[in-house]
Amino acid sequence: MRSTLRVTTVALSMITMGGCGPDSPGTLQLPNQAFPTEFPQPTGRPLQIEDYYRFQNLRGLLVSPDGAWVTYALALPVEETNGDVHEVWVVAADGSEAPKHILHNGQEVMAPAWTEDGRLRYTAGEVWSIDPADPSARPRAESVSSVSGNPSPDGFWIASLEDSPMVESSARAFSDFETRHEGRFRGVQFDWLNFQRDGAPFPAPDPTANPPREIVITRVEGGAAPEGDVTAESRKLTDLGLRPGNPVWHPESEILAFTADPNWQDERRYGRSDVWSVTVDGELTRYTDDGWNYGSPAFSPDGRFLSYTGGYGTDMIKEAALDHGGPRDLFLVSLEEGVSINLTADWDLDPSGPLWSPDSEHIYFRAEKSGGTHLFRVSTAGGSVEQITHGERSHDGIQISEDFSTIVYSLGLFETPSDVFAADLDGANERRLTDLHTAIHDEVSLSRAERLLYPSYDGTPIEGWLLYPYGYDPAAGPYPLVVHSHGGPHSASGYGFDFKHQLFAANGYFVLQTNFRSSTGYGDDFKWATWGAWGDKDGEDVMAGIDYAIAHFAIDPKRVASIGHSYGGFMTNWLIARYPDRFVAAAPGAGIVNWISDYGTADIARTKETEFFGTPWMEEAARRMIRQSPLTYADRVQAATLFIHGEVDQRVPYSEAEQMFVALKKNGVPAKVIQYEGQAHGIRGHWNSVHRMMNELRWFDAWMGPDPSGADHPGEGGTP
């Protein structure tokens, strides 16, 4: 029987104001929660690992300029190739028509995009376009400009970035003998600090060895010059010796805004950017120079303002020895007056992806909030931030049509994979446009989740979600529990479908996710609450969630496991070391165990100089790193532990897993390592994903899982 998508019950017609009351950013209320007492039994079968290849991954939402059509891409996993088949579809945004699969001469197409006149453009050998209302009509061949860059609104200029000539160094010439032996060398050599980049060959190229680049504008061939403009074919507008990001045009084609890192060649400093502008006559203006990290510059449609986002720069935090990070805000500067204001100074979440309204009166943006992503806006005249979309849900990939009539997004829940939705700009009149997994819903009963709001040990409100085991019946319990911790740590768990979690639930496990302190979407104080002590308060938040779940559901406190990847892997290692009598099994993925060894061997380890107050050779920082390292407490671990790691992980080096594995084996604790060949920090590929899930499930089943035969599992005296 098909499960019902609950999102249709959420009213979206009201725009509410942020900043006060229970709907405020960063505010969680702790109600006296009442949980269901009756649990209807599933009518479909449980999810199986073989179902993995039946789930379609939704990608690349794009709405047409007039808001009438939506194109999206599907990636269908293929077991035989370890790859995907990619499909492009188009659907009417009003929900009046079924989605249409776009093919070109029977073949799949690529790179969908919308033209200004509302045609759907795609690549199939060459570039073509079709009328979305009639995809079967003969496609029209589209010409492709050979000029790369950003055209000005008046069509007269193309703005681009041009590398400056490199100054050749004068090195001593080698003798013939030296040349022969240099040619025989097999290995790597480097003398730059940032020699690692996860997923890149080792060593990564020296980023400071790149040439400076400048902004150049080139006259479009055949372009009509503005009245009275006598100009050369090309102009170099800047001579900063920096490496600017892609410039954006002022609506009157007279100014370009861009960002650039003023310290880009200093390898000891951390990347950040300031905001600049330059006129087509080369007049330069710098808007920021305060140590913050700025981005996303955009001019208002009426040409009066420039907006940009910004947050504390890493060097700024480090040099001031701050005990917290900073906010991320949205700024507005008047081009006439040169005055900058912070539009979100009194708002406690992190705006991203800002977009101007056509009337220049509002800026729309996305932000995480309480396990979801929502659309917000703020008036350019100031005032409170307004929340547009609402509900216990996450609006992913939000797109706004060029005419600002329609928003589109993907939406999924714990028990429902993502589908495409559209709504009016104010969030009202929501339409579901796709139904991608009907066959699965008709056959498989997926487990639903319960939202938990509970106090941590010090009373701090924490949000989490508990996924029920398939066929849950309290009288048949107690059931084992798998606790999943998210990565980051400055990220969040939340609303959305997760195949692995559903697989655990289908095999008789509760699955708990918590947004512990350091998670995003709950305000700055919450986000930075673990500063200098990763694992302490956030670990308590996870443990309090376990206690809360056990108190309210039929969970066996003697059969609890921890799992997670990256920071979630660290958290797993931390929990089993600091709360050894609470866990019987664990599966940390790419988890740090030793902050000292991580410092010099990982590609971003040095950024932790902020949250650990320094480097390993500084006494206070070293003390904190040792204190917060799971390896320090390895002698306490009792949980049978499966270490998952990529062979060439440069974000959390494989040696981190080795250190903890050796410690556990030396202490007689069951442990196993699975290392994925050629894999970096994110272990990719369908074969690897399936293999990993199979082995994690086997490990948990072996040490604490339900056994239909009633026989003892290895956690009661055997080995898996």
Listing of model-derived features with the role each one plays in the protein:
Residues 71-78, 121-126, 160-165, 204-209, ...:
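Beta-strand C-termini and the immediately following turn/loop, strongest in propeller blades
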